[in-house]
Amino acid sequence: MGHSNVWNSHPKNYGAGSRVCRVCGNSHGLIRKYGLMCCRQCFRSDAKDIGFIKYR
């Protein structure tokens, strides 16, 4: 196996790397609460469409 084939060759079934945003595919800043599976940037842009209301 060459050097370029080593990275991401092992399947990720658990941990932070296994979960990605359903909108953009990003794995950083993921909101999993209520089954959103959405990163915080996508949540800010789509929160009103989902039904979340900002009180402050």
Curated annotation (Swiss-Prot):
Cross-referenced InterPro entries: Ribosomal_uS14, RIbosomal_uS14_euk_arc, Ribosomal_uS14_sf
Keyword annotations from UniProtKB, A to Z: Metal-binding, Ribonucleoprotein, Ribosomal protein, Zinc
Signal sequence region: none
One GO molecular-function entry: structural constituent of ribosome
Disulfide bonds: none
Species the sequence originates in: Triticum aestivum
Highest rank taxon of the organism: Eukaryota
Pfam families xref list: Ribosomal_S14
Name under which the protein is recorded: Small ribosomal subunit protein uS14
Cofactor: Zn(2+)
Binding site for Zn(2+): C21, C24, C39, C42
Cofactor remark from the record: Binds 1 zinc ion per subunit.
Gene Ontology biological process terms from the UniProt entry: cytoplasmic translation
Protein family (similarity comment): Belongs to the universal ribosomal protein uS14 family.
GO cellular component: cytosolic small ribosomal subunit
